[in-house]
Amino acid sequence: VTTTNLYRGTTLSGLFLILLATQAIGQGVRIPTAFEQTAISNEKNLIAAKKKDDGAFFKRTLAEDFSLVGIDGQLVQGEEAAGSLGDPDLAELAPYDMKVVALGDNGAVVTYDAVVREAPQEDQGPPPRYQHFSSVWVKLDGQWKLKFHQATATHWGDW
């Protein structure tokens, strides 16, 4: 093996690895569309409002027929649902892996996983630490409204 052949083989191998890495990186990054960015922004605003129990945000953002399925699996609607959305004891709600499914131009389903940390209540333990959330957003009269929200435990007992 000559030095030239060794150099040529090393160079070709290096170029091949760079090409593979470039393609892998390019395929893994997907820029969200403007529609998806709007839906994700709406959901992040909801998360911030949940942490602060921001009644003004809920009043302005929830659809009139808003309904909620809580971590206990119970369906609540109307004022009861709006009152169940905020949680001032929520120490952490860290979303990850957000996905958006468009429902035409005027609707979206936003789903994501989240790490949840909350102070335990006296009569019960803390909620499941890992949860999956789903929200249905609809555009009514030019404004995005939250029509439905659901929390589902993904791991019980992981504190």
List where the protein language model places each region.
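A beta-strand edge to alpha-helix "cap/lid" segment located at domain peripheries
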Residues: Q27-W159
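Bacterial N-terminal signal peptides that target proteins for export
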Residues: T2-G14
